[in-house]
């Protein structure tokens, strides 16, 4: 347990975390540009949550020994993984509902007016797909179902790290 509690204070685990999250973003772009799967609004929101995880990893990598930096990284990690899980869950409900009027997909992402990411970087944040379509599956799970699993694993990992740190070090 002490080994696990020490991980957040080291740079290598944060780099590994950032690398894994970066690979998720690259995978999303591969699905979009090489496999021709058009991302929908919910996909873009999930992509944004993954970007939040990447930002958390970069923050943690910058100075993992500093408690304030770790707290900021933990916070961004928690918000991104929980928000991503909620968005993925809602996306699954959109795909599996039999009521065609239960959900509607917006035409463009609802980013804040001061930060219209879909206008600044349309190749990454523009949504061109339909939220109700299931265009890809692996092992019986759709893309949002896999993202739900991934976000849950990220949240569980954070919970495990924070809990072990609190139990052994009595500090974050």
From Swiss-Prot:
One of its GO terms (biological process) is protein folding. The chain crosses the membrane at residues 14-30, 49-64, 72-89, 146-164. It is found in: Cell inner membrane. InterPro entries: DiS_bond_form_DsbB/BdbC, Disulphide_bond_form_DsbB, DsbB, DsbB-like_sf. One of its GO terms (cellular component) is plasma membrane. Belongs to the DsbB family. This is Disulfide bond formation protein B. It comes from Pseudoalteromonas translucida (strain TAC 125). The lineage of its organism: Bacteria, Pseudomonadati, Pseudomonadota, Gammaproteobacteria, Alteromonadales.
